[in-house]
Amino acid sequence: MKIMAIDYGDARTGVAISDALGWMTGQTAVIHSRKPEKTAEEVARMLNESGAERLVMGFPRNMDGTEGPRASLYRDFAALLEQITGMKPILWDERRTTIEAHQILSENNYHGKKRKNAVDAVAASLILEGYLAYLRNHKE
């Protein structure tokens, strides 16, 4: 089963889609938009084109596990996604994904504008990889 993960942001939203078996990240993209409706419509288009059957969305949590200050904004966007796509997003803990994405890009000599254009897609890939690992470890 294909799964899509997103790293929602004010100006850029990273997208990662698994391979057909749901084992690893297959493709990534970045949606450039400051308008939640436009972002949600683009996610819907990508869901349809990819055939993804599940949507995972990074959700902000503090290091102690409580909801972060932007949680209500993310919940509102998740509700908008469900309304537009007909698919309820799974809210997935995104703690440290952007930090890890920056580290990965630094180690691979991505700097400046090149890094800015890639960090959201890498963060979405990390969200997806975390979710896929969870599924592998919790098979019934």
Regions found by a protein language model. Give the residues of each.
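Phosphate- and other anionic-substrate recognition elements at nucleic-acid/protein interfaces
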Residues: K2-I3, D10-E140
